[in-house]
Amino acid sequence: MKFLLTAINAKFIHSNPAIYSLRAGVGEKLQPYVELAEFTINESLESILEGIWKRQPKVIGFSCYIWNWKLIREILTELPKILPDTEIWLGGPEVTYDGPGLLREFPQVTGIMVGEGEVTFREVLEQYLREAETAGQSEQQPESDSTEQQVADRRGTVAGKSVVERFGQI
């Protein structure tokens, strides 16, 4: 199971500390399940999509800010075409103000992480790992026949400790 945390930075020399903080916040035991990817707004959409596709994540999270939101919106439209079974999560200041509205606008998005990112991300990651363990899936998890229903059951915004309870709302 691979959860890809993705940052689209304003410049090549900039880095996104949020994704590093999220990975550090899950602790050493869970860090092997988290991969980081950084791109810039100056890269082409095709180049970014190729970089994501090469990593083949089961789940991808985007760190959304005012400087990258337009490009992320384009990625959200194209990503399901190349990785149809990859679940998509959003987080960051550009998306947390209207989670339900964004979920209606982008039905391909599984959920929006709100609240304390480190707490919320850890809970989301733990939930995916519990599901994989319950399903008896190895690290190279085969897709189950009910993936579409599992996504529908979990879709929604999440906040802090209530993340598992709130899967399925919206």
Model regions and ranges:
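Short N-terminal binding/cap micro-motifs at the start of the first secondary-structure element
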Residues: 12-18
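Short acidic-aromatic active-site loops that bind/stabilize oxyanions
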Residues: 11-12, 65
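Nucleotide-activated donor-dependent transferases that construct or modify glycoconjugates
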Residues: 2-11
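Glycine-rich beta-alpha loop elements in corrinoid/cobalamin-binding modules
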Residues: 18, 22-25, 33-170
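N-terminal subdomain of nucleotide-sugar transferases
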Residues: 1-3, 26-33
